[in-house]
Amino acid sequence: MALIMKGKPVADAIYEELQPMTSLNLTLGIIKYKGSDAGGYLSGLSKAAQRLNVQLRVNEVEQFQELTQSVVVMGKDSQVHGILLLKPFPKEWNFRQASDLIPPEKDVDALHPVNLGKLAQGRGNLVPATPQAVLSILDFYNVLPLEGASALVIGRSEAVGLPAFLQLMQRNATVTVAHSRTKDLPSLSRQADLVVVAVGKPNFLTKDHVKEGAVVIDVGTNVLEDGKVVGDVDRENVEPLVRAITPVPGGVGSVTTACLFKNLFLCYQEQTR
């Protein structure tokens, strides 16, 4: 019977670790597109912020120029300790141009080229929140020694796939990255002790993709037409085969939020050195 690696105990442990934050009166600046459907995520951030006595300063923008201006203003404001660009934004906007304007020491998403470069060199404190959550879950439940393990990351985004690859490699796992052009994915994934899937497609990973006793981390969050939230894994059919699996909802997402506030604390420490 598979171990269900729920996110709440992991997130609670991180919040406990972050209790020193409560006396610091930190502020997280959030910039979102006016009218976007990010309300649910913002609500989760708000609850976590209250728990840690963090103030949220939310700016809503309608034009790309407003976005870049808001980033610059918050970047110069000493009372703002971290900046988060809350997706989604219009597809035609140059998101990377805007995110690159965030000072590296205020980059709670850890996607600035400076922070990703340091991560690649193995000397970065800031790690993108979602892959940081993946490692936190694996460490908390301790179901698989990463050293020497065969790991497959499905998805190569700079927010999840790339940093997950770097972190797992630095933990001495043997890591392969798969993507939309990968040939014969099932035969590749059936060799993996650990599968991390982040493709944004409901029920993408089936029982044909996993070997018996593997560990599966489902990063996906997909809303079906009937409103049901599911992951990238066909959990009903995969779960009976594997040693451990994260649920959706209730898995990686809540830990990602906690890791975001951990990054805010690290940003503050960087700014006050």
From Swiss-Prot:
One GO term (biological process): purine nucleotide biosynthetic process
Classification via CDD domains: NAD_bind_m-THF_DH_Cyclohyd
One GO cellular component term noted in the UniProt record for this chain: cytosol
Superkingdom, taxonomy of origin: Bacteria
Pathway terms, separated by semicolons: One-carbon metabolism; tetrahydrofolate interconversion
Enzymatic reactions: (6R)-5,10-methylene-5,6,7,8-tetrahydrofolate + NADP(+) = (6R)-5,10-methenyltetrahydrofolate + NADPH; (6R)-5,10-methenyltetrahydrofolate + H2O = (6R)-10-formyltetrahydrofolate + H(+)
Transmembrane segments: none
Key words of the record: Amino-acid biosynthesis, Histidine biosynthesis, Hydrolase, Methionine biosynthesis, Multifunctional enzyme, NADP, One-carbon metabolism, Oxidoreductase, Purine biosynthesis
Annotated GO MF terms: methenyltetrahydrofolate cyclohydrolase activity; methylenetetrahydrofolate dehydrogenase (NADP+) activity
Matches recorded under PANTHER family: C-1-TETRAHYDROFOLATE SYNTHASE, CYTOPLASMIC, C-1-TETRAHYDROFOLATE SYNTHASE, CYTOPLASMIC-RELATED
Job of this protein: Catalyzes the oxidation of 5,10-methylenetetrahydrofolate to 5,10-methenyltetrahydrofolate and then the hydrolysis of 5,10-methenyltetrahydrofolate to 10-formyltetrahydrofolate.
Protein name: Bifunctional protein FolD
Organism field: Coprothermobacter proteolyticus (strain ATCC 35245 / DSM 5265 / OCM 4 / BT)
